Amino acid sequence: MSGPGTPFVIGVAGGSGSGKTTVTRRVIETVGREGVAVLNQDNYYRDQSDIPFESRLHTNYDHPAAFDWALLREQLDALLAGVPIEMPEYDFTQHTRAAHTTRVLPGRVVVLEGFFALYDEELRSRMGLKVFVDADADVRFIRRLLRDTQERGRTPESVIEQYLGFVRPMHLSFVEPTKRYADVIIPHGGMNEPALDMLAARIRVMAQRD
């Protein structure tokens, strides 16, 4: 957990399509854009530029081993120390990291958003608030289907195949169990306004302690 004078870290976890981004937006609205640094865990998938494209297509993106945990910890620690970072960007059409990065400045609050945000013990130890966004599996699948076809150039068939072969079983094995680490569980996903209001009130109190 962060100490006096250091940024306050919030972990926002939950299944794919559960509403994590909506929760993160509420944090930004609560604290103010310039006061929040956001680390999207999707950008910390391992670089696969040394692997043939056809082989990349078979990557299990829903397994913890797909992530570069060391880099994520390193960059989170840099933000906690007040040092700007160059966050990698992941190209989901090429299934590897993009050549460019995004500069992220330190803020009073750091949000780590991703379905494995609460998976790593070292990352959890840096968090002042751990949130799990819960949503019905059917709702999550529909949201994922729309996102991947509209934003990531995927075909509906490939999204369905990935969901049945990887996403669902990996969620049950690795994501759902991290719910027990959460300080706050938001049922009904990002559409739960009363829960989001309560979360916002809690964040205001905790973020102002320093």
Curated annotation (Swiss-Prot):
Main subcellular location: cytoplasm
Pfam families the record matches: PRK (PF00485)
Pathway terms, separated by semicolons: Pyrimidine metabolism; CTP biosynthesis via salvage pathway; CTP from cytidine: step 1/3; Pyrimidine metabolism; UMP biosynthesis via salvage pathway; UMP from uridine: step 1/1
An annotated GO BP: CTP salvage
InterPro entries from the UniProt entry: P-loop_NTPase, PRK/URK, Uridine_kinase, Uridine_kinase-like
SUPFAM superfamilies on file: P-loop containing nucleoside triphosphate hydrolases
Catalytic activity annotation: uridine + ATP = UMP + ADP + H(+); cytidine + ATP = CMP + ADP + H(+)
Binding site for ATP: G14, G15, S16, G17, S18, G19, K20, T21
Keyword Membrane found: no
Protein's cellular compartments: Cytoplasm
EC number: 2.7.1.48
Keywords attached to this entry: ATP-binding, Cytoplasm, Kinase, Nucleotide-binding, Transferase
Highest taxon listed in the record's lineage: Bacteria
GO molecular function: ATP binding; cytidine kinase activity; uridine kinase activity
Listed transmembrane segments: none
GO CC aspect terms: cytoplasm
Family, similarity comment: Belongs to the uridine kinase family.
Name recorded for this polypeptide: Uridine kinase
Taxonomic source organism: Deinococcus radiodurans (strain ATCC 13939 / DSM 20539 / JCM 16871 / CCUG 27074 / LMG 4051 / NBRC 15346 / NCIMB 9279 / VKM B-1422 / R1)
Gene name for this UniProt entry: udk
